[in-house]
Amino acid sequence: MGYLYYLLHPYQLRSIIQWKVWHDPVHERDPSTESPELQECFRYLNLTSRSFAAVIQELNHELLVPITLFYLCLRGLDTIEDDMTLPLEKKIPILRNFHTTMNEDGWQFHESQEKDKELLEHFDVVITELKKIKAPYHEIITDMTRKMGNGMADYAENEEMIKNGVQTIEEYELYCHYVAGLVGEGLTRLFVESELANPKLAERPSLTESMGQFLQKTNIIRDLHEDWQDGRRWYPKEIWSQHVDKWEDMFNPAQQTKAIECVSHMVLDALKHSEECLFYMAGIKDQSVFNFVAIPEGMAIATLELVFRNPEVLKRNVKITKGDACKIMFECTQNLFTVCEVFKRYTRKIAKKNDPRDPNFLAISAQCAKIEQFIETLFPKQDPKKLTLTQAQAQNKEPTMDAGEAVVLFGVVIAALVCISGLMLGTAWFFGARFDHIFREASVFLPGREKATPMITGHEEL
């Protein structure tokens, strides 16, 4: 991207500078303490990974080497699977037995034509370092490689899927499980084994699965045009057939509106994993591990917003800008709250771009609202406008008394009545009023007193 772009978009340049200047790695790798073989492993990590190399090398030293080797093993496996020049009768046994082959001293593979073939040609350095890590870590890496290798072999043998593409959403999610869900499972086991994550994460496989599904589905949605050119079709027919009659119509300019609606449908399917991804990240204890899992998820939600209702995704492989990537990385290396803010920001952008004419308009709007509602349960906060209104209403409201104030007020009223009554009686007595007759007449009503007999003064008895 040229200088002119950054002159026209200074905020992009600001984000890049902010990341370069202010980002402080939690842990730094020390090459001086590494063996020549391990240094070679990190060189291949940098060669084969653009997205994960930097963040892996900032991991806690307890997991730095195990996760690097785990990545290289899976990258080697993936290189063999992607190599279309290898005949199936040769590829399938390698995939199914890779978990044992990667423990054979000196093993190398020189028949691949893929871009990452150099890793396989010098895979013996990975094997050497694998034998040095702790036994529990080695066991986890071997087990995950076995599961993934068998899953890849199953798909390689599935001629129907290779010819006609993925048919159902269930098949689509099973594929995502093998290529990404298993990676998440292995990483979670490593996090828990190293005591850098809440052990309860190991008991919630759905959370781990959502982390992998969210990333892989995002990649598949974004790589639509590239996969089509390579003869691959990962969009499930169960989804695209609701919008176009033939797969080729997705790239027909006359069918662009329908194709965009299909991509929107795929984005909706990916967004359903958002809440569980955020919940998973809440279980990470170590900051470097949190950065490792949060950065890809932040990039994924930004990528979904980029491809949503974007016709360019039908013509080329679109990517978020370097400035946006640096801004997201800076925010995702803080804490869960800032990650939630990233998700909220891009979710709102998706909701804003949503088109009422889209068949999934209501479902997409509801899913975006659901994500925001979930974030609100994690970090509830009051609306300043509502808070100001509540305070104003409280000030205008009649003051209320508590029990103590009521007793005091009652006592004051009684005392006032007594004083006023005493003053009136004293005034009457001063002016000659006689109260003794009143008291004498009233005394006859007291117990033990006889009532006075009235004197006869008239002739009423006659």
Curated annotation (Swiss-Prot):
Q: In which pathway does it act?
A: Terpene metabolism; lanosterol biosynthesis; lanosterol from farnesyl diphosphate: step 1/3; Steroid metabolism; ergosterol biosynthesis
One GO CC annotation: endoplasmic reticulum membrane
Question: Which topology term describes how it sits in the membrane?
Answer: Single-pass membrane protein
The protein's location, in the record's own words, is: Endoplasmic reticulum membrane; Microsome
Supply the EC number(s).
Answer: 2.5.1.21
Q: Is RNA-binding there in the keyword field? A: no
Set out the biological process GO terms recorded for this chain's protein: ergosterol biosynthetic process; farnesyl diphosphate metabolic process
Say where the protein is mainly found. Answer: endoplasmic reticulum
Tell me which cofactor or cofactors this protein depends on: Mg(2+)
Residue ranges of the TM segments: 406-426
Indicate yes or no for the key word Endoplasmic reticulum.
yes
Can you tell which superkingdom this protein's organism belongs to? Eukaryota
Q: Which reaction does it catalyse?
A: 2 (2E,6E)-farnesyl diphosphate + NADPH + H(+) = squalene + 2 diphosphate + NADP(+); 2 (2E,6E)-farnesyl diphosphate + NADH + H(+) = squalene + 2 diphosphate + NAD(+)
Keyword terms, alphabetized? Endoplasmic reticulum, Lipid biosynthesis, Lipid metabolism, Membrane, Microsome, Steroid biosynthesis, Steroid metabolism, Sterol biosynthesis, Sterol metabolism, Transferase, Transmembrane, Transmembrane helix
What GO MF terms are annotated?
squalene synthase [NAD(P)H] activity
Query: Anything else of interest in the record?
Result: In Fusarium, the biosynthesis pathway of the sterol precursors leading to the prevalent sterol ergosterol differs from yeast. The ringsystem of lanosterol in S.cerevisiae is firstly demethylised in three enzymatic steps leading to the intermediate zymosterol and secondly a methyl group is added to zymosterol by the sterol 24-C-methyltransferase to form fecosterol. In Fusarium, lanosterol is firstly transmethylated by the sterol 24-C-methyltransferase leading to the intermediate eburicol and secondly demethylated in three steps to form fecosterol.
Database matches in NCBIfam families? squal_synth
Q: What does this protein do?
A: Squalene synthase; part of the third module of ergosterol biosynthesis pathway that includes the late steps of the pathway. ERG9 produces squalene from 2 farnesyl pyrophosphate moieties. The third module or late pathway involves the ergosterol synthesis itself through consecutive reactions that mainly occur in the endoplasmic reticulum (ER) membrane. Firstly, the squalene synthase ERG9 catalyzes the condensation of 2 farnesyl pyrophosphate moieties to form squalene, which is the precursor of all steroids.
Family, as annotated: Belongs to the phytoene/squalene synthase family.
Protein known as? Squalene synthase ERG9
Gene name on record?
ERG9
